Amino acid sequence: MRVYYGHIASRKTILTYSRSLRADEISGMRGQTRRGVIEATRQGLPVSGVEELLKSGRLTLAEVDRIVLPRKTLSHRRKIGRLTPEQSDRLVRVVRILAAAEETFGSQDKASRWLRRPTKVLEGEAPLEMLDTTEGAREVEDLLRRIDHGLAV
């Protein structure tokens, strides 16, 4: 099952994002309903979610710095143990896109290459570069949906 912006598959759990990504473990939201994800995001997710993305190789520190939170802030948040609601929201957005890309392309490696390759459809930007804004993330999700459905891009 796939999860896209504004749409959660019938089971309505974060667990359904992607079996391979284990998004629930990465973002600290195991088995949460959509409402639970909203509440957890508002309270601030554990910093361990960012650490897992780094450890898994899905994002580099430079990418986290650019699209989730600055390095200096990450260092500060490690001491506190939790992200702010805004940082948590960015983390959820990134995890959702990573999971959708891995689901669409069938592997972490293929998804990683696609996310980092500039494309004309995104006016020469790489999909990963678009994730620093909500609208950019929506555009990437729309593109993934078109690819997944075999529509020309």
Describe each model-derived feature in a short phrase.
Residues 1-153:
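Non-transmembrane "mature" sequence context
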